[in-house]
């Protein structure tokens, strides 16, 4: 199966780890997302490799990628599979009024996550606010 991913290069404003969720800052650079960004439309995508401040890194802005996850009890729960920004560049289950930016892609070996685990997600950006 072929996947169409959209990946672009951006300059980092600060240190970014591989598979961090990132956002635009006021200078047009990218920075790691935090939990406060769950209600922000500035979320851009998922860093495809780590970098230091001032370096360039590739960011997946639409498509399938690995991502850092928070503790998600059960991927099969419809509310838990819709993801938003969480602490330290992670994705976690979206709450009401959060921008849903991705959905988890579970498989037989991956049905839940502990805090800091990596998982496969479909990232589509901040287009829907969870009601």
Locate each region found by the language model.
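Surface-exposed, low-hydrophobicity beta-strand/loop segments enriched in small/polar/acidic residues
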Residues: 1-131
């Amino acid at each position: 199966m072929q996947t169409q991913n959209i990946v672009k290069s951006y300059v980092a404003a600060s240190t970014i780890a591989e598979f961090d969720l990132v956002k635009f800052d006021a200078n047009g650079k990218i920075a790691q997302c935090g939990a406060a960004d769950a209600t922000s439309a500035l979320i851009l995508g998922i860093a495809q490799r780590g970098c230091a401040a001032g370096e360039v890194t590739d960011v997946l802005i639409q498509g399938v990628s690995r991502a850092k996850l928070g503790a998600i009890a059960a991927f099969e729960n419809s509310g838990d599979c819709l993801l938003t920004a969480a602490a330290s560049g992670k994705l976690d289950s979206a709450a009401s009024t959060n921008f849903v930016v991705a959905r988890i892609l579970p498989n037989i070996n991956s049905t839940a996550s502990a805090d800091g685990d990596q998982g496969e997600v479909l990232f589509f950006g901040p287009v829907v606010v969870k009601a």
